[in-house]
From Swiss-Prot:
<feature type="binding site">
    <location>
        <begin position="146"/>
        <end position="153"/>
    </location>
    <ligand>
        <name>ATP</name>
    </ligand>
</feature>
<dbReference type="InterPro" id="IPR050052">
    <property type="entry name" value="ATP-dep_Clp_protease_ClpX"/>
</dbReference>
<keyword id="KW-0143">Chaperone</keyword>
<dbReference type="InterPro" id="IPR019489">
    <property type="entry name" value="Clp_ATPase_C"/>
</dbReference>
<protein>
    <recommendedName>
        <fullName>ATP-dependent Clp protease ATP-binding subunit ClpX</fullName>
    </recommendedName>
</protein>
<keyword id="KW-0862">Zinc</keyword>
<dbReference type="InterPro" id="IPR038366">
    <property type="entry name" value="Znf_CppX_C4_sf"/>
</dbReference>
<feature type="binding site">
    <location>
        <position position="35"/>
    </location>
    <ligand>
        <name>Zn(2+)</name>
    </ligand>
</feature>
<keyword id="KW-0067">ATP-binding</keyword>
<dbReference type="InterPro" id="IPR027417">
    <property type="entry name" value="P-loop_NTPase"/>
</dbReference>
<dbReference type="GO" id="GO:0051603">
    <property type="term" value="P:proteolysis involved in protein catabolic process"/>
</dbReference>
<dbReference type="InterPro" id="IPR010603">
    <property type="entry name" value="Znf_CppX_C4"/>
</dbReference>
<dbReference type="GO" id="GO:0140662">
    <property type="term" value="F:ATP-dependent protein folding chaperone"/>
</dbReference>
<feature type="binding site">
    <location>
        <position position="13"/>
    </location>
    <ligand>
        <name>Zn(2+)</name>
    </ligand>
</feature>
<dbReference type="Pfam" id="PF07724">
    <property type="entry name" value="AAA_2"/>
</dbReference>
<dbReference type="InterPro" id="IPR004487">
    <property type="entry name" value="Clp_protease_ATP-bd_su_ClpX"/>
</dbReference>
<dbReference type="GO" id="GO:0046983">
    <property type="term" value="F:protein dimerization activity"/>
</dbReference>
Length: 455
């Protein structure tokens, strides 16, 4: 028995009982005094970190009192911008998408009217037990449109006009709690950071969740395997979209039982979800074209009507709830984003207007860049049209415009800062057609000169 005891070892460090001062036995395990000391040190360090985080959060609260100087949406009903005012501002920043801008203007106006109504009723009933007032529910927004059509820009412009915190989240990085990836609460942390950790201000903000179509479940029928980045994320987002008190870890990452969390009421936050929903047109066309495809169609008039119905450009205007369910969104999720706006695919004419009309148009941006080098940049009308035509061919929406102009202006911006004698440069249609490059000619003396080409 004594020989057997001599071979007892610590289950954690592997040292025998002869190498340590004390070996404590448990049900099938042993731990030495050195490992116990190490555990105590780890616990003391974690306790110290928790106290430090608590002190830091208290300091943040002292620095950010309720009377934060940063402005937010006034909750007086008469001060909330009217839908016509909101759309007018959107018109100055976003070209086209008239229907989507109208839907967004009304939805945003109603959302902040709802917040004003809530504040009014709370103040009215603070000294009364009567709570018979009508409760207004929140209506989140779903934007459906091809890539580069302006979904993110619309949401960002709304937040700029209303002067509220705005955060963008990518749905593709989200996973269900307990799996590798981001928890849905990290979306709220981004909004908090934009609000300088002011909870009251963040609760009046706007969150745009991009690529929402990427969390559609992989098949229409529920799967026996767990879909942690698809349907699982939709389930996790339900309460947040509807309105709940969410616990947000101030440092990000996973929630920890020993770490303090910031509580945010999401019932006042406006969620705008956007996605391209590639393939949704096919689902709509299949549903609408069933009755008039096949041998049962006898009249020529029916054939003409069928072509009109299944036109891909117009099919999403006839979108129904069942189409989104077939695409992979669960009904509970769709029910929490009742306002749906479909964005049009950008035409050549719209792309041409995007280049020149908005306040931050690309042509204006590059003119400003070259003006810093004392060079006046000009675009011939034909060159703007040629750039828009090339962007339309690439089928990536307005995003293609910047890449084309960057490629077109590369040699120009590389050489012009060193050419003090050039005060003006003109982009022509011929430059765009000739693989987007301007000619740089070497003179016999070794100096370089940019030759302007005429159309």
């Amino acid at each position: 028995m004594a020989k057997f005891d001599a071979h007892l070892k610590c289950s954690f460090c592997g040292k025998s009982q002869d190498q340590v001062r004390k070996l404590i036995a448990g049900p099938g395990v042993y731990i030495c005094d050195e490992c116990i000391d190490l555990c105590n040190e780890i616990l003391d360090e974690e306790l110290l970190d928790n106290q430090t985080n608590t002190n830091n959060s208290q300091q943040v609260k002292k620095k950010l009192p309720n009377d934060n100087p940063k402005k937010c949406v006034p909750l007086e009903l008469t001060s909330i911008p009217k839908p016509l005012e909101i759309k007018s501002f959107l018109d100055n920043q976003v070209v086209g998408q008239e229907s989507a801008k109208k839907i967004l203007s009304v939805a945003v106006y109603n959302h902040y009217k709802r917040l004003a109504w809530k504040v009014k009723e709370e103040s009215k009933n603070s000294n009364s037990t009567d709570s018979q007032a009508t409760k207004l529910q929140k209506s989140n927004i779903l934007l459906i449109g091809p890539t580069g059509s302006g979904k993110t820009l619309l949401a960002q412009t709304l937040a700029e006009f209303l002067d509220v915190p705005f955060a963008v989240a990518d749905a593709t990085t989200l996973t269900e709690a307990g799996y590798v990836g981001e928890d849905v609460e990290n979306i709220l942390l981004r909004l908090l950071q934009k609000s300088e950790m002011n909870v009251e201000l963040a609760q009046k903000g706007i969150i745009y969740i991009d690529e929402i179509d990427k969390i559609a479940r992989k098949s229409e029928n529920p799967s026996i395997t767990r879909d942690v980045s698809g349907e699982g994320v939709q389930q996790a987002l339900l309460k947040m979209l509807e309105g709940t008190i969410a616990n947000v870890p101030p440092q990000g990452g996973r929630k920890h039982p020993y770490h303090d969390c910031i509580q945010i009421d999401t019932s006042q936050i406006l969620f705008i979800c956007g996605g391209a929903f590639i393939g949704l047109e096919d689902i709509v066309q299949k549903r609408m074209g069933k009755h008039s495809i096949g041998f049962t169609t006898n009249s020529d008039q029916n054939k003409v009507d069928t072509k009109k119905i299944i036109d891909p450009r117009d099919s999403l205007k006839n979108l129904e709830l069942d189409d989104l369910v077939k695409y992979g969104l669960i009904p509970e999720f769709i029910g929490r984003i009742p306002v749906c706006a479909v964005l049009d695919r950008l035409t050549k004419e719209t792309l041409e207007s995007i280049l020149t009309q908005p306040r931050d148009a690309l042509v204006k941006q590059f003119k400003t860049l070259l003006s810093m080098d004392n060079v006046e940049l000009k675009f011939e009308p034909d060159s703007v049209e040629a750039i828009a035509n090339e962007a339309f061919k690439r089928k990536t929406g307005a995003r293609a415009l910047r890449s084309i102009i960057e490629e077109l202006m590369l040699d120009v911006m590389y050489t012009l800062p060193s050419e003090e004698n050039i005060k003006e440069f003109t982009i022509t249609k011929k430059m765009v057609d000739n693989l987007f490059s301007s000619k740089i000619v070497k003179l016999p003396s070794g100096s370089k000169r940019i030759i302007k080409e005429s159309a």
